[in-house]
Design a protein with these regions (language model features):
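N-terminal accessory regions of nucleic-acid-interacting proteins
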Residues: 1-82
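Conserved DEDDh/DEDDy metal-dependent 3′-5′ exonuclease domain
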Residues: 105-198
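Short gly/ser/thr-rich secondary-structure transition/capping motifs
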Residues: 69-72, 89, 117-119
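Long, charge-rich alpha-helical interaction segments
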Residues: 190-214
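Short, flexible loop/turn motifs enriched in small residues
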Residues: 98-104
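Two-metal-ion RNase H-like nuclease active-site motif
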Residues: 84-94
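Catalytic micro-motifs at enzyme active sites that drive phosphoryl/nucleotidyl and oxygen chemistry
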Residues: 74-79, 93-97, 125-126
């Protein structure tokens, strides 16, 4: 999917990308100097430049470039190319304010196994282990998990980030993580405790409407 993507390139929005597909330009390799596409000379130059840069970063196995350039609700597009270096991440805390509260538990799933980091046991091991991955996947991590982790450990997480909150919101799913799970038919039984009920003790708040560009 990534090589069919143009929306991350300067001057290319969703409507223009759709027009490019309809004109026959469906992936990077189909672009040529004499291709007939609905763009001015300047925008065609920017498209060519963007494709060249994209090829370079994909060759260098660098998902951060695409994470920064793609709208948050389109970050799923680089998932297939980097799926072998992804950490699915969730944290639980003593409260909602990262300046006053602490992380009690971090759960990390890499597609094969789950690693749990617990305060007072092995929580500090997370700092080294997370560096093994090029992409982090969260729900509401842009607003909560990532800033909380960075402040708590005094580190900077430089990985590419896919926040499912923005992707799900763009698809019409509302009501925070638990609400999305219910709408998708996912039932975790007694584990499915509403986020607001747990916020005062150990878990992140239930997230609603995103507040960044999607």
């Amino acid at each position: 999917m990534l090589q069919n993507t143009f929306i991350h390139i300067q001057s290319i929005g969703a409507i223009t990308e759709q027009r490019l597909w309809e004109s026959g330009l469906r992936d990077w390799d189909e672009f040529t100097d004499d291709i007939s596409i609905p763009l001015s000379g300047r925008r065609k130059y920017l498209l060519q430049k963007g494709i060249d840069e994209s090829r370079q970063h994909l060759y260098q196995n660098n998902p951060v470039y695409f994470s920064k350039c793609l709208p948050a609700n389109q970050s799923w597009r680089f998932f297939p190319e980097f799926r072998n270096s992804i950490a699915y991440l969730d944290i639980e805390t003593t409260g909602l304010d990262r300046h006053y509260h602490s992380i009690t538990t971090i759960a990390l799933y890499d597609g094969e196994s789950v690693q749990t980091y617990v305060q007072g046991q092995n929580l500090e091991d997370f700092i080294e282990d997370i560096q093994k991955y090029k992409v982090i996947v969260t729900y509401n991590g842009k607003s909560f998990d990532i800033p909380f982790i960075e402040h708590f450990f005094n580190i900077k997480l430089g990985q590419a980030h896919i926040d499912l909150r923005y992707i799900l919101y763009s698809l019409g799913f509302r009501g925070g993580l638990k609400g999305c799970e219910r709408q998708l038919g996912m039932d975790r039984g007694d584990l499915s405790v509403d986020g607001h009920a747990k916020a005062s003790t150990t878990e992140k708040p239930d997230a609603g409407k995103p507040h960044v560009r999607v």
